[in-house]
């Protein structure tokens, strides 16, 4: 009987996604394919997972890595570390608190926050934007709610994802499905 009770309180496990991510970034002249194994936290939505993959594509380079993400408080969703293990890029998703933004700006050479969530994201930005002006290494990019919602519909456990970036606009395709995104720069560096 005790085993049956314990079985119900065991933590849910992450779902594994296999992703072949082809990035064609005409703005940065970056053209590579990344084979990623991505763990989706039980509390993570398909929309957030796809925003994470989009953020990876928009910053793709050789040493860029996905971290433990939602399962740890002191790591970003994505980071780039130097060969000497110093943080060069900290990529956060969603609506981090001003405290987390401040701490991440102190830990990394560059910080990018990809906010999403429509009106909630706008309220978050209005609340913290005045306290972020002193951070010269912070960039805030907002993704429109309708676009990220459509992106979430593309999620599947095995994906071949093509991301094309040109003139700040993004096209994401999985099979025959295509989503166009126009990220808004709320704070540039």
Q: How does the language model describe each region?
A:
Residues 1-9:
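Short, Lys/Arg-enriched N-terminal segments with co-localized hydrophobic residues
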Residues 19-21, 78, 169-173:
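Short polybasic amphipathic segments
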Residues 65-83:
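Long amphipathic N-terminal alpha/beta scaffold segment
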Residues 78-80, 87-101:
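Conserved catalytic cores of phosphodiester-cleaving nucleases, focusing on short active-site segments
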Residues 96-153:
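Feature captures the catalytic cores and cofactor-binding loops of soluble hydro-lyases/lyases
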Residues 137, 143-189:
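Non-catalytic C-terminal interaction segments of nucleic acid-processing enzymes
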């Amino acid at each position: 009987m005790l085993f049956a009770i314990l079985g119900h309180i065991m933590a849910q496990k992450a779902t594994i996604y296999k992703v072949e991510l082809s990035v064609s970034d005409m703005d940065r002249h970056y053209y590579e394919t990344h084979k990623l194994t991505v763990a989706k936290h039980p509390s993570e939505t398909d929309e957030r997972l796809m925003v994470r993959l989009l953020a990876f594509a928009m910053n793709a380079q050789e040493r860029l890595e996905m971290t433990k993400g939602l399962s740890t408080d002191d790591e970003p969703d994505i980071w780039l570390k130097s060969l000497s293990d110093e943080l060069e890029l900290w990529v956060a998703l969603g609506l981090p608190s001003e405290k987390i933004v401040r701490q991440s700006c102190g830990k990394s050479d560059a910080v990018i926050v990809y906010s999403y969530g429509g009106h909630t994201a706008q309220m978050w930005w209005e609340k913290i934007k005045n306290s972020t002006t002193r951070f010269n290494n912070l960039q805030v990019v907002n993704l429109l709610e309708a676009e990220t919602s459509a992106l979430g519909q593309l999620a599947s456990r095995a994906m071949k994802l093509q991301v094309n970036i040109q003139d700040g606009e993004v096209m994401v395709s999985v099979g025959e499905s295509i989503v166009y995104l126009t990220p808004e720069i709320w704070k540039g560096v």
